[in-house]
C-alpha cells in the first residue's frame, strides 16, 4: 500500500507568480492538486536536510517568478570554438525523472520542481543581453534547459 501522495499532488505558487498565463495554464491542467501560496520558492526548494529519495517518490511543483539573473555564463569547456560564447538560462529547476546517468541527479538537494512563470521577462532579458554585447560579432550558444529536462515537462 502506497501512503505517499501522487506526484504533483501539491503545487506551491509564489504570490508574485499568480497572474502569469503560465501559472494559470498549469493550475487548470492540475485541478485536483492542492494549491499552497508562498512568499518565496527558496523557502521550499533546495533547503538543507531534505530527503531527496523520499521527495522523488512524490515530487511537488513550485511556480515562481524569477526576479533577476536571467542569463548565466556557461562553462568555458563547452565552447564551440573561439567564435562562440556559451550562456544558459534557468527556466526550470530539476527534473521529473530519476535517470542514474544524468548530472541533474544530485545537482539540487530537493526533488521538487521549480518552474519560473514569467517567460516574457526571460525574452526581454535575452533581447537586451544581445543588444548590449560588446563582442556582437561572436556567435552565442544559449541553453534554455541547463538545470532541468525541459522537454520532459512539456505536456
Language-model segments: which ranges?
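Flexible, acidic/Gly-rich N-terminal and inter-domain linker regions that tether
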Residues: 1-85
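Local cysteine-cluster metal-coordination motifs and their immediate loop/turn environment
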Residues: 90-107
Amino acid at each position: 500500500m502506497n501512503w505517499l501522495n501522487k506526484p504533483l499532488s501539491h503545487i506551491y505558487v509564489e504570490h508574485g507568480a499568480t497572474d502569469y498565463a503560465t501559472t494559470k495554464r498549469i493550475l487548470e491542467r492540475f485541478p485536483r492538486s492542492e494549491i499552497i501560496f508562498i512568499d518565496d520558492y527558496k523557502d521550499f526548494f533546495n533547503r538543507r536536510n531534505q530527503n531527496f529519495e523520499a521527495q522523488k517518490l512524490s515530487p511537488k511543483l513550485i511556480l515562481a517568478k524569477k526576479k533577476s539573473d536571467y542569463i548565466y555564463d556557461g562553462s568555458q569547456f563547452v565552447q564551440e570554438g573561439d567564435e562562440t560564447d556559451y550562456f544558459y538560462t534557468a527556466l526550470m529547476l530539476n527534473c521529473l525523472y530519476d535517470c542514474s546517468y544524468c548530472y541533474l541527479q544530485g545537482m539540487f538537494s530537493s526533488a521538487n520542481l521549480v518552474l519560473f512563470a514569467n517567460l516574457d521577462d526571460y525574452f526581454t532579458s535575452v533581447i537586451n543581453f544581445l543588444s548590449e554585447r560588446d563582442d556582437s560579432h561572436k556567435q552565442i550558444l544559449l541553453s534554455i534547459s541547463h538545470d532541468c529536462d525541459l522537454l520532459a515537462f512539456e505536456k
